[in-house]
């Protein structure tokens, strides 16, 4: 059982992180002209592209969800077409066509950005974890870091013009600028609680909300913040004022409170939902929309006298919302979801796409184009164009699938919990269940041809290793004696006879006779090993807990610890030849080597979601994340024209 916990953390860390963010008040703000709301393998001969003289590097792009899959917390539109959203891992995306298309921008930070506020199409500020503040004056083409003067997370921001803005956050933090962020000055809030949202309508009048129904009000630009009586003890996550008098705050359990006199009195309103509301946006004193958990969207056209539930078409959590007029609005939230309305919410249309949001546990590519990913609830995805499109396949099971191995475009096997084994011979058009002979979870599988394959797992009660072997394409599976008293989770065969299995407490087993005999090898570590990749009988790499990477060049007679450069859990590894390999893991970690692991270089994944496996240049993980490594090429310079020399005149004799 030692290994099962870190493995499951791969699936749970992302959702727990989002949940903790929501529960601790990572959900925020508003302003009259802007809003920010926030809640907290099998090796292939094709190989990775080798660097060429024109190559300047590579980056990882999102293939699922699109335009990206990081949770979005803040959104700010300045007109019906132009808007910016921010989220996990420093995510900033921008649209200039009403959300039909979104461009990913470089924020220059990996800190989660919880709040964003634009006052016009060019000037905007985003705030986030550890006091991060980034600023743009050119619509996001460039973002520059600013010094907030605090290490507290900033959860919301509200600007009223290009120069004047206020950010609030953890532990009652408030910082203020009057010069576009060149300097930020700390203000005294009078509370130690997290301030979750803020809304200013002009340079002087602003309101911030917090836990326990706390509402703070200033009429002098924050020189003094005065506590108001909200009438609720619930956490307030969002607030929006349309002028100095008219404002609405929303929060836990569907809480809505309203003021028409600048907060002198707050009156409770019936939202019609028990789902928590994380964001709110009004375009005028009458027309407003609040969003929250379980896909809830509620709308008022009479200043909150009545709130009507609208159909979002999803149960995903919405965290931020921005309306620029009574009709045009955008809601954002978990796993990068984006919804758009142009009719006041009568119809909400998705502007983001996801072939799945189920976590993906393994992936197998047989060439640069053809690959299959498997995951939770029996999810199977297939691509034949390098991931440009992924298609759901029918697995016939709701059991989580933990491993997959294809030997060519047609023949593949997937394994999973409760002894699940599925087989396809037509590229996944049909998957046929096979009899494994066990109800124990199977974590990995490796086939070398259509007949010979090995699956590994462990008995959950005795925590002893399990190895199953087939020599007839899975028509029959036979348990092999292995002597392992640790879970077995990773397997790699290079031919029908030679294979290696890894697992808990640093265990490594090796066979040269198709598994008739499994021989323990000395790993030199007690760290759990989660995956192993061999490219031939001699060269192999295993990865695991605490950034562990082990390398052998002699078939495992000797394993050498390599410097991965990370202490994060590494859950997947894929080598395409003896030199080129990629390892992935927790919190979006990706490291790559081009020299057999003598050096490992960190690459920016663009996400903090856990990545479970990698095959060739495609990584998969939490929330259906699919990332693809693509080369960035230098533009080929245009040759200069060579001038035709003019004939020299013949000198006279």
Residue ranges and their predicted role:
Residues 19-637:
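Residue-level hotspots at or immediately adjacent to binding/recognition sites across diverse folds
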Residues 1-5:
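Positively charged n-region of N-terminal signal peptides that target proteins for export
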Residues 9-18:
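Bacterial N-terminal signal peptides
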